[in-house]
UniProtKB/Swiss-Prot annotation:
Name the UniProt record assigns to this protein: Waprin-Thr1
GO biological process, one term: defense response to bacterium
Disulfide bond entries: C29-C55, C38-C59, C42-C54, C48-C64
Keywords: Antibiotic, Antimicrobial, Disulfide bond, Fungicide, Protease inhibitor, Secreted, Serine protease inhibitor, Signal
Compartmental location: Secreted
Gene Ontology cellular component annotations, sorted alphabetically: extracellular region
Function in brief: Antimicrobial peptides with activity against Gram-positive and Gram-negative bacteria as well as fungi. Recognizes carbohydrates in the microbial cell walls, and induces structural damage to them. Also inhibits microbial serine proteases subtilisin A and proteinase K, as well as human and porcine elastases. Carbohydrates that are recognized are LPS, mannan, peptidoglycan, and N-acetl-D-glucosamine.
Amino acid sequence: MYKKGTILVLAYLLIATAVCQLSYKEGHCPLRNSVSKCIPRCVSDYQCSFNEKCCPNKCGSESCVQASPINTGNGYKGSNDDVYCAGVKCGPYEKCQFDRKTKREKCVRT
């Protein structure tokens, strides 16, 4: 038979896992300068509707927007965020974009 403490620890871990999954949603944030919607403001993905993420906007805050299927990063030289496309690191001033002809992601100039 399990001890009462072991069962409580397992229950706590299950609840913590469920909460963590609710606060992060799949997908990537679009480029900050392409998010013109400044409201509603948010702090975490769990505050947004089912298909939206909490992402930086051009107003300097974060708001709920439709998630992007690809990682666009911010693509600017000197940023701390590297941008990768299909496992390849994009250069400075490049972002990851889906090419409709080849049906693949590729690095393009911003």
